[in-house]
Curated annotation (Swiss-Prot):
Protein name: RNA polymerase II degradation factor 1
Organism: Zygosaccharomyces rouxii (strain ATCC 2623 / CBS 732 / NBRC 1130 / NCYC 568 / NRRL Y-229)
Post-translational modification remark: Ubiquitinated.
InterPro entries: CUE, DEF1_CUE
Low complexity compositional bias, start-end: 84-101, 134-159, 209-220, 236-260, 346-370, 455-489, 509-521, 556-571
Record keyword Ubl conjugation present: yes
């Protein structure tokens, strides 16, 4: 064993232990491939049996021999890098050519234009580089004084360094692509270039990170701002030179110095990256009339930015430009303040302005009913309200939902006018606190606002409030109904809940009062029975273990137990009527009485189960087999688990299957004749009623009333007699009806039948 393992582990060219086959293969392979050593080949030979496959793999290069891992030499590395750089430069050049083309068009088109663009944009606090004047001095936008100084210095340097600065960019870029462009070594150029490229990428990332923080009036403006703040001098100067001097663009002389070549296109790279975006903005900005479109675009931007502060900042400038157009409320001064201030103070001011705007809006909505004409005269504010209006309604509805109860108490006839100011004030408060709401509101500007809008708004608010009140009242009514229903019908809830509900709601009908106690107990047993999954939902469902213990007999919450009966449910105080058990009054009553109103009121079972009370298939609940047993066997089957009285299966007296009847027959008859609407539900009543009929019975028989113990014994005796009589009587019915072999025949509380399953 050790030899084998050694053999497999140590084939290192000494083929002494290798068997002759492998030796032969190795020799042929070394002849074919003289540069392969045995060490290289031996693993292959072990892996593939067939010589041909090995040869095939080696020749096709699928298999290579072990070799030293070498670092590529410096020359190789440089060559590779040069190739990469050249490719990169070609791509860049194509890009730049396109960009410069656009750029020249832009500059020629727009710098000749009126300087009003510069003022409005500067007013908005965007540090766009198009707000610079042609001579290279900058209107101080967004606090960029230091920046502009830097850029001017760099421009001067460039002008000193080169005879004609904005030489034809396209040609410069092309000439740079030629490797034989001058004295400098290509390696130096390439390395410096790659560094530049990395810087550019980093700065782009920086921009993207900054973009959500800075307030995005227009996407391009902020990107340019970011680039100017974050870039080193080279790129800033590039943007400056590319924009500031459009006049000399026409004169194009190719610059000769190699250094000029290296710097020039590199500088352009930033302009190339940043240029296409400003182009779009310029087109937008040139049409100040198209305020609606601008607003839409700005709102889209607002959706993109995540920070709510940015959203606020972004919404203000639009209204500011409109204000400037109509110089209405002297917000112009505010705006220019903002520009010199830092961004934080911008946001604070804008919040304040929003507050002002909303207060104005409130005043307007209050003035509205008196004078719609005023509103039209306030030209600019229309747009503000347009932006606010819908959000206001939203907020109102929100608040109404949160303050439902207050509204109910405060105003039963809701005329929204007196209330509205306070609500809008609340709305203002919530808006300042909650930036996200602000964002949602900005996304729905409506541009043309009819003067009547606030009236509509008020009407709508009134409508909302009325709706809310109606809903609340309905809910309360519904609750009351539910509770009554729960009390008069099924106790699906836990007993604690039930009692709470009873306390809360005065029962309207005396019937509910009567059944209240019964219900508490019913709830308890129902909760107990919920343990079996389907018992309450599906009346026909049974399974073998179901009837083992008295408390889980099918559908059996023992109806109106007598105090004398000890059972599992004595703890609940009162027994309760349940799905299939019929209140005592009907124990001996004819089956016709089954469907009378009394059963409906007395049993707490939900409506859908009630028709089942008249036991549908001849008293059996075998859901699927019922017809077989009933139709095909018209005779009764002997019932083996029965407790002695009668060997066939028999329903207990008058369909009341599971409850042993502890009353005298006299009592049964009387109670059947008693008012069917009255079913005893409380224990005190039970005791009285129970003792009354028995006493009457005895008095009729001319006997003395007995003391309780005797009475109990006599009741028990009578009960047995009655049961036997009932069993005998029912045997005939059973023979006709063909009762199923099953559950209904026994007394579940008696010991004798206990072990049947």
């Amino acid at each position: 064993m050790s030899a084998q393992s050694r053999k497999s582990n140590s084939h290192n060219g000494k083929n002494s232990r290798v068997n002759p086959e492998i030796k032969f293969k190795l020799e042929t392979l070394t002849e074919l491939f003289p540069d392969w050593t045995n060490d290289d080949l031996i693993d292959l030979v072990h892996e593939y049996d067939d010589l041909e496959t090995i040869i095939d793999k080696i020749t096709s290069g699928a298999v290579t021999r072990w070799d030293e891992v070498k670092k590529p030499s410096k020359k190789e590395r440089l060559e590779k890098r040069l190739e990469q750089q050249q490719q990169l430069q070609k791509e860049q050049q194509q890009h730049q050519l396109q960009q410069q083309h656009y750029h020249a068009q832009d500059l020629d088109g727009h710098h000749g234009g009126s300087s009003s663009h510069h003022h409005t944009k500067a007013g908005q606090g965007s540090g766009s580089r198009y707000s610079r004047d042609n001579n290279g001095t900058h209107s101080s936008s967004g606090g960029s004084n230091a920046k502009s100084k830097k850029q001017q210095q760099q421009q001067q340097q460039q002008q000193n360094g080169k005879p004609s600065l904005p030489s034809d960019n396209a040609r410069a870029a092309i000439s740079r692509g030629k490797p034989a462009s001058g004295g400098g070594s290509w390696a130096a150029v390439a390395s410096s270039d790659s560094k530049k490229h990395q810087q550019e990428e980093e700065e782009e990332e920086d921009q993207q990170q900054q973009r959500p923080e800075s307030s995005p009036e227009e996407p391009s403006a902020t990107t340019v701002q970011a680039s100017e703040t974050k870039t080193d001098g080279v790129e800033a100067s590039a943007s400056a030179t590319s924009t500031a001097q459009s006049s000399t663009h026409a004169t194009a002389t190719a610059s000769t110095g190699n250094a000029a070549h290296n710097e020039k296109p590199k500088k352009m790279s930033w302009a190339a990256i940043a240029a296409p975006k400003p182009k779009v903005v310029q087109k937008k900005q040139s049409s100040l009339n198209n305020v609606g479109g601008l607003k839409k675009e700005i709102n889209e931007v607002a959706k993109e930015t995540e920070t709510p502060a940015a959203g606020q900042a972004q919404r203000e400038p639009v209204s500011e430009t409109n204000d400037k157009a109509t110089n209405n409320q002297g917000k112009k001064a505010d705006a220019q303040h903002e520009d010199t201030a830092s961004k934080l103070s911008e946001q604070q001011q804008q919040q304040q302005e929003q507050l002002q705007a909303q207060q104005q809006e409130q005043q307007q909505t209050q003035q509205q009913d008196q004078s719609p004409i005023e509103f039209q005269s306030q030209g600019t504010n229309q747009e503000d309200t347009a932006q606010h209006n819908r959000p206001e309604e939203q907020k109102d509805t929100r608040e109404i939902t949160s303050n439902q109860v207050q509204i109910d108490e405060q105003e039963v006839a809701a005329t929204s006018e007196p209330q509205e100011p306070s609500q809008t004030a609340q709305a203002v408060a919530t808006e300042v606190n909650d930036g996200s709401k602000v964002k949602q509101q900005q996304q729905q500007p409506t541009v043309g606002v009819e003067a009547g809008k606030p009236q509509q708004q008020q009407q709508q608010e009134a409508y909302y409030q009325q709706q809310q009140q109606q809903q609340q009242q309905q809910q309360q009514q519904y609750f009351a109904q539910q509770q009554q229903y729960a009390q008069s019908q099924t106790p699906q809830h836990a007993p604690q809940q039930l009692s709470g509900q009873q306390a809360a709601v005065g029962q309207p009908n005396a019937n509910a009062n009567a059944s209240a106690n019964a219900n508490a107990a019913a709830a308890a047993t129902a909760a107990q029975q919920q343990y079996y999954m389907y018992q309450n939902q599906f009346p026909g469902y049974t399974y073998p273990g179901m009837f083992d213990s008295p408390s889980y007999a099918y559908g059996q919450q023992q109806a109106y137990q007598q105090p004398s009966q000890p059972s599992a449910q004595a703890g609940f105080g009162t027994g309760t009527a349940s799905q299939y058990s019929i209140p005592q009054g009907y124990a001996a009553a004819p089956a016709a009485d089954m469907t009378t109103a009394s059963t409906a009121t007395a049993s707490p079972v939900a409506g859908h189960a009630q028709p089942q009370q008249q036991q549908p298939y001849g008293g059996s609940f075998l859901p699927y087999y019922a017809h077989f047993y009933q139709q095909s066997f018209p005779y009764a089957q002997p019932q083996y688990g029965m407790a002695g009285q009668y060997p066939y299966q028999v329903p207990k007296a008058g369909y009341n299957y599971y409850q042993p009847q502890r009353q005298t027959q006299g009592r049964n008859v009387q109670q059947g004749q008693q008012s069917p609407g009255h079913s005893p539900s409380q224990q005190g009543e039970d005791v009285q009623q129970q003792s009354q009929p028995t006493q009457q019975n005895q008095l009729q028989n001319g006997q003395q009333p007995l003391n309780p113990q005797q009475l109990q014994f006599q009741q028990y005796y009578q009960f047995q007699q009655q049961q036997q009589a009932a069993a005998a009587a029912a045997a005939a019915a059973a023979a006709q009806q063909g009762l199923p072999y099953g559950y209904t025949g026994y007394d579940y509380t008696s010991q004798a039948s206990r072990g049947f399953y």
